[in-house]
């Protein structure tokens, strides 16, 4: 995991997805972050959160991982304390993210774990049922760079507010030219 760029199983940050041109502006100040996908910054840069060693604490049915990202790491402003808690209760897995920043910054955490709930060798995940409690998403341009706006999921292939099969819309042209889900 330290040398691969695939991010398999990783907690992604400080900013999941792409930052176009590896720069952004907060409060009138431009910040340049580490480019690692052409001219863009993908998943927090060359040494994103998925490459870090996290502290952890175990509780019954849960484990919490914590990482402190110092001010200036990969070019991002402000120290950030990130926590990710995994809970397994009955047959339900939940992943909860928390981040606290010391000053205005960019934080967008996600997980890059891929589950096939049918088990190894069971085939496609198209029939898996997914629920996502999100009413909006970040549209992207043709280079998968977020446009900076939020759009409603209603009426799109990204609407999983009620349980739906993953494969129902997986190959829609509006999903990355038919390549699948790659959205916030």
Where are these regions (language model features)?
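An exposed, glycine/acidic-rich loop-and-rim segment of catalytic or binding clefts
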Residues: 1-184
């Amino acid at each position: 995991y330290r040398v691969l760029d695939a991010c398999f199983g990783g907690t992604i940050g400080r900013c999941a997805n792409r930052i176009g041109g590896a720069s952004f502006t907060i409060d009138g100040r431009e910040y340049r972050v580490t480019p690692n996908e052409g001219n863009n910054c993908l998943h927090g840069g060359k040494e994103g959160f998925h490459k870090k060693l996290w502290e952890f604490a175990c509780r019954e049915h849960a484990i919490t991982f914590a990482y402190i990202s110092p001010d200036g790491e990969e070019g991002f402003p402000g120290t950030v304390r990130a926590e990710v808690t995994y809970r397994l209760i009955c047959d339900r897995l939940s992943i909860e993210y928390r981040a606290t920043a010391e000053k205005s910054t960019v934080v967008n955490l996600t997980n890059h774990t891929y589950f096939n709930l049918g088990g190894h060798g069971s085939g496609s995940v198209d029939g898996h049922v997914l629920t996502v409690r999100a009413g909006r998403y970040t549209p992207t341009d043709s280079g998968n760079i977020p446009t900076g706006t939020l759009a409603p999921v209603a009426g799109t292939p990204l609407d999983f507010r009620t349980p739906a099969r993953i494969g129902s819309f997986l190959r829609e042209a509006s999903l990355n030219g038919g390549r699948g889900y790659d959205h916030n």
